[in-house]
Amino acid sequence: MTCEQKSRPVQSCQMLPDVVSNEQQSLVLVKKLLAIAISSITYLRGLFSEKAYGRKYVGELKVYILREDSCPGAQQIVHWLQGCFDALQRRYLRMVLLSIYCDPDNPQKVTECYQFKIKYTEKGPQMDFESKNGQSLTKMACDNTQKSSMLLVRKLYMLMQNLGPLPDDVCLNMKLLYYDEVTPQEYQPPGFKEDDNGTLMFEREPVNLTMGEVVTPFHSIKMNVTTEKKRIEPFEDDVEVCVSTKWSLKISEDGMMSETSVQQECMTKENVITDAGIEYSETQETQEQPHRHTKEDFSTNPKMDNLVKKTADLKVDARKTRSGRIFEPQISQLEFPLSQDPQPSVPKRRKVSVPK
């Protein structure tokens, strides 16, 4: 008696495109990155069972995408994403804030927060190559979209697997912020309503991690993660994470979320973990600094290629994220002033939406 062994089919369909040549392709890429990132966060933090996800590939990295018909919670998040996409298509969406909290009656008191900032361009991003005397030498269009997308997803997976566990029972919330100068005051995405509360509070001292940015000729998306400091497991023994005794997180006029220490005790230092590609940034900022791309950012990098190639089938220990660690009752505030002016006599309300 002979047996025929069936080989597992090779995944040929990739989620992300190789080339982005028009605005529609760019829009699809940003939508997919949002869906991948938010689905990956819920999967790697153990918020839903594995049956709630379908499997896709980003390069050689297997990712888990929420399926709308799998469970009510997954269906709700998919509906949130559809609301995000509506605002994104209209070029209204400025930022998506995905927060994790423990008290169902107090969604402003969070334990973890993920920020996705969106920008739109007309002629496509350009990067300047400058000489030592500051003179611009040349310009070229950014065309490394797929590689930067793969690296951003990989960084997210590596970070999620090195974070300490969440409490047993947690909830999700989403806030949407807009470009107020172009967004009609009456506009609300499907499934969202206006939010009157502009403050988030952390139970323990938070730390911000800058994950990275993906740039296309028509959009850019930047991702940051804010979590409790003691939840971060160091990648290296000599890594220092800059902290302060009390934090405020503000949204400036251009939508940049800047962190400041009330007691001015934060070290103005950046620590870059080269192996994981994750930047721990705690430098005090009051406004967004323009990011200057260097030639190395977009040139062929063997080390970067190696990081992408060795990321297939990262294993996840779901129990690690659900162990119910007990937190001390320390409070840190993240304040989101709804003002577009530095010191207005009567503050203007910045438009913010939350799910209905």
Curated annotation (Swiss-Prot):
Residues 282-305, 333-356 are annotated as: Disordered. Gene3D superfamilies: HORMA domain (3.30.900.10). It comes from the Eukaryota. It is found in: Nucleus; Chromosome. The keyword Nucleus applies. Residues 347-356 have a biased composition (Basic residues). Pfam families: HORMA (PF02301). The keyword Nucleus applies. Residues 288-298 have a biased composition (Basic and acidic residues). Its main location: nucleus. One of its GO terms (cellular component) is nucleus. Residues 24-225 form the HORMA domain. Keywords: Chromosome, Differentiation, Meiosis, Nucleus, Oogenesis, Spermatogenesis. One of its GO terms (biological process) is oogenesis. InterPro entries: HORMA_dom, HORMA_dom_sf, HORMA_MeioticProgression. Plays a key role in meiotic progression by ensuring that sufficient numbers of processed DNA double-strand breaks (DSBs) are available for successful homology search, promoting synaptonemal-complex formation independently and playing key role in the male mid-pachytene checkpoint and the female meiotic prophase checkpoint. This is HORMA domain-containing protein 1.
